[in-house]
Amino acid sequence: MGNESSTLVDEKTPPSVLEARTVEAVAKYVKEKPVRRVVVMVGAGISTAAGIPDFRSPDTGIYANLVHLDLPDPEAVFDISFFRQNPKPFYALARELAPGQYRPTLAHSFVKLLYDKGKLLKHFTQNIDCLERLAGVPGDMIIEAHGSFATQRCIECKTAYPDDLMKEAIAKGEVPNCAECQGLVKPDIVFFGEALPSAFFDNRTLPETADLCIVMGTSLSVQPFASLPSFVADGVPRVLINRERVGGLGSRPDDVLILDDCDNGVRKLARALGWEDELERLWEEANPNQKSREEELATPRTREERLENEISRLTAEIDKTLKISDAYQKRVRERLEGEPLSSPESNGTGLAHVFPHLARR
């Protein structure tokens, strides 16, 4: 396992378990088997409809704005060594990334529906936005491969830091310090120079026991997350819900490709299962701001306008907060040249590995 063909299965090759490689056949399989051990694997695409800024945009994204600030390198904001030297840039940015201002998507609610029906074995995510938790999926059902904002601790003595104090610090753009040793506090998200959570490796082979695998909104280009679908046993259906085919999905007789955005894809599957009304109700209940769909549609500002305002405020805040002297910049650049940041293209441990939204196109 871990290596499989990327060649699309011949259309003439019949499925071994499903009646056909269709959404309807998957729904029939789920209901008749019956399926009880679904493993879900997701990436940044599952959160697109939540309105989270597209950090990758070359002209308007947050990443593009960081490029023009007085940083030795935009990626330094997410480097643990740089964070130790100057945590202010990260906390200026954290307000845009922290949970609470974005609502779960229909795809997140679909995962919750799987859990409610007793069918979810485990949910693997590359995202740090905690939207699965906001949708109601219990934390013990989630493997956050790149960590998340759900918890935080001191980077020195590892003492946990209270949630309420962390939320207050992020809201104010302040840097929190440990009450025990005065060390810097950081959310439990994976920075450059840090290992992935042990929970990921402890559960990495869990897909071997699945009776259905659903992959959504990920390019499957970053290891070790990208290898997860290959652990699914032959003969177990794998469903890809994504705008394009990725990884080795589609190479097995029982792989089903739903090439669409994640929300449309889960709606199609829910409709075939007879779950559409339940899914819509769960999604409505998952709105932390308790706005109706009509109210959301009536909101006068477009997503682009909201994003532009958010980026302008963020850039101004970081520009005001971050005042790195020329001498300090020189020292940091020299340190980074001596200890180069990992490259996403070279070994999969770079920015895309930690923050999928920030990956360069």
Swiss-Prot record:
Q: What are the residue boundaries of the Deacetylase sirtuin-type domain, all occurrences included?
A: 16-276
Q: Which GO terms describe its biological process?
A: rDNA heterochromatin formation
Q: Keywords assigned by UniProt?
A: Coiled coil, Cytoplasm, Metal-binding, NAD, Nucleus, Repressor, Transcription, Transcription regulation, Transferase, Zinc
Main enzyme class? transferase
Catalytic activity from the UniProt record: N(6)-acetyl-L-lysyl-[protein] + NAD(+) + H2O = 2''-O-acetyl-ADP-D-ribose + nicotinamide + L-lysyl-[protein]
Q: What's an example of a GO molecular-function annotation for this chain?
A: metal ion binding
Localization, per the record, is:
Cytoplasm; Nucleus
Specify where it is mainly localized: cytoplasm
Kindly state what the record says about how the cofactor is bound: Binds 1 zinc ion per subunit.
Cite the InterPro entries for this sequence.
DHS-like_NAD/FAD-binding_dom, NAD-dep_sirtuin_deacylases, Sirtuin, Sirtuin_cat_small_dom_sf, Sirtuin_class_I, Ssirtuin_cat_dom
Is the keyword Ribonucleoprotein assigned to this protein?
A: no
Question: Which residues carry out catalysis?
Answer: H146 (proton acceptor)
Q: Which GO terms describe its cellular component?
A: cytoplasm; nucleus
At which positions is NAD(+) bound? Answer: 43-63, 126-129, 217-219, 242-244, 262
In terms of superkingdom, the source organism counts as Eukaryota
Q: What is its EC number?
A: 2.3.1.286
- PROSITE patterns recorded: SIRTUIN
Name the needed cofactors.
Answer: Zn(2+)
Answer whether the UniProt record assigns the keyword Coiled coil to this protein.
yes
In this chain, Zn(2+) is annotated as bound at: C154, C157, C178, C181
Per the record, the coiled-coil ranges are: 294-328
* Family listed: Belongs to the sirtuin family. Class I subfamily.
Summarize the protein's role. Answer: NAD-dependent histone deacetylase, which could function in telomeric silencing, cell cycle progression and chromosome stability.
What is the protein name given in its UniProt record? NAD-dependent protein deacetylase hst2-1
Look up and give the organism this protein is from.
Emericella nidulans (strain FGSC A4 / ATCC 38163 / CBS 112.46 / NRRL 194 / M139)
